[in-house]
Structures are given as C-alpha cells and as structure tokens.
Amino acid sequence: MQQLRKLRWGIAYIYASSNNTMIIITDLTGSETVARVSGGQVVKADRDKPSPYAAMMAAYKAAQIAMARGINAVHVKVRGPGGYGLKVPGPGAVAAIRALARAGMIIGRIEDVTPIPHDTIRPPGGRRGRRV
C-alpha cells in the first residue's frame, strides 16, 4: 500500500528578466519568506545570471531550503519585467519550474502574474527618446 505524505503548500514566485532570475518561496499566505535565491548567487560570471542553467541551479537550491523547512508542494507564479519592458518572462522561467519539479517538489498551479498596462505607460527617455 502506498503511503500518502502530507502536503505542506507554499508559493514559488519566479521573476525571470533578461538580466537575472529570482526564485522566492513563501508560505501559503505569502507573508513569510522561506527561501530566496537568485541566479547571480549560483554562478560566477555576470553574463551567466539570466541563463537557464543559473535558473535551474537557483531553483534547486531554493527547493532544498524549502524542503528542509517543511514545504514540499508549491503553486508557481511566474513574472516577467512587464510595464514598458518585455511582457514575456526571461529565458530562465521554464528551467526554474522544471528544476523545482525535479528536486522533488509537487507543482500545483502555474500562473503568469506579469504586470500588463491596460492603456499604456510613458517609456523612459522623454519625448525625443534616448539619444546615444
């Protein structure tokens, strides 16, 4: 007979931009941070921060910390830069979700929470744009 393990849920916030990937795991209310790791903490070179490899290593490290503190299942919220920036998450988002699953965490819902403007916002640089 298969033994059922008790699931303790948390929320994994994955912020994937073109410069870095951050993984933050909180409890279900979102008020207490359990683990917080970025891609820059696990690679040496700055150019490697946004890579899928850095996101994978950061997600694995965050999952180990969270599982040591008792959280073994997460709902994932993926976020890109949004606003006047890119509306799609960076290259590390999918790799981070895959690494969370491979680390032994149970994945619940996956949701995109990128901030999308409903009319528009004024881009930086003024009326004539950025002069180079």
Swiss-Prot record:
GO cellular component labels: ribonucleoprotein complex; ribosome
Keyword Iron-sulfur assigned: no
Complex formation: Part of the 30S ribosomal subunit.
Keywords (A to Z) from UniProt: Ribonucleoprotein, Ribosomal protein, RNA-binding, rRNA-binding
Stated name of the protein: Small ribosomal subunit protein uS11
PANTHER family to which the protein is assigned, alphabetical: 40S RIBOSOMAL PROTEIN S14/30S RIBOSOMAL PROTEIN S11 (PTHR11759)
Any one GO molecular function term: structural constituent of ribosome
Family annotation (InterPro entries): Ribosomal_uS11, Ribosomal_uS11_archaeal, Ribosomal_uS11_CS, Ribosomal_uS11_sf
Superkingdom: Archaea
PROSITE patterns on file: RIBOSOMAL_S11 (PS00054)
Organism whose genome encodes this protein: Caldivirga maquilingensis (strain ATCC 700844 / DSM 13496 / JCM 10307 / IC-167)
Family membership: Belongs to the universal ribosomal protein uS11 family.
GO biological process: translation
